[in-house]
Amino acid sequence: MTMEILLVNDDGIYSNGLLALKNVISEEFDANITVVAPTNQQSGIGRAISLFEPLRITKTKLADCSEGYAVSGTPTDCVVLGVHQVLKKVPDYVISGINIGENLGTEITTSGTLGAAFEGAHHGAKALACSLQVTTDHLKFKEGESPIDFMNTARIVRNVFKKFIDDEFPCDVININVPDNATENTPVEITKLAKKMYSMHVEERIDPRSRSYYWLDGYPIMDEEDGTDVYAVRNKRNVSVTPLTLDNTAKNLDEFKEKYAKKF
């Protein structure tokens, strides 16, 4: 049976990572792939939606001359419009990526790549998010085409996808992170989220009128515990596969109830 796949990202519709993933998946599977992605770079936007401005959908041509839909909004907007306006149905899968830069640890809540995947799961689709580690900072937020070769990563994502395709989906979102030097022979490790991916840093600068302005930055954390996504990708150089859920309820709900319910 032909699968219906909605392909999105947060790096913009002309990203090489999105195109590589589209081409590799279309070669392997019997699938209708619809690309709906932001017109512009949307990294760090999380699961934000546009409430105070109208959205536009523009048909466009990707680098391989196939058709895509550019949305003047966030990755989550792309999923919403993809489901309700472009496809007019919930696809079998929402796949988000390939992101330029890893999405690890609890900071995934800031990721537009993960935001789109969670929105897909919220609509009832099976969802995957996939990201490639990038150690060259100036490439991480590049808009449009990039000199990075995404084909190895696309094949790795395809191989991981194949493991789940015939099974009941085990979670809401599968988060795949690929080390920058990975090949199809790189080990795949099932992981949990690390506490932190970056140590936050704020850089203050002064503008020509002597007023302060700020850049938010961070330093990569390497010393997370074994078994986490950060340790798998950055220390062991393994592909990380992390099952995620939309339900943010604390794991210790019963303990919380027992301790606090009588206080209300």
UniProtKB/Swiss-Prot annotation:
Binding of a divalent metal cation, residues: D10, D11, S43, N99
Could you say which enzyme class this protein belongs to?
A: hydrolase
User: Where is it mostly found?
Assistant: cytoplasm
Question: EC number(s) for this protein?
Answer: 3.1.3.5
Q: How is the cofactor bound?
A: Binds 1 divalent metal cation per subunit.
Disulfide bond sites: none
Can you say what this protein is called? 5'-nucleotidase SurE
The species this protein was found in: Methanococcus maripaludis (strain C5 / ATCC BAA-1333)
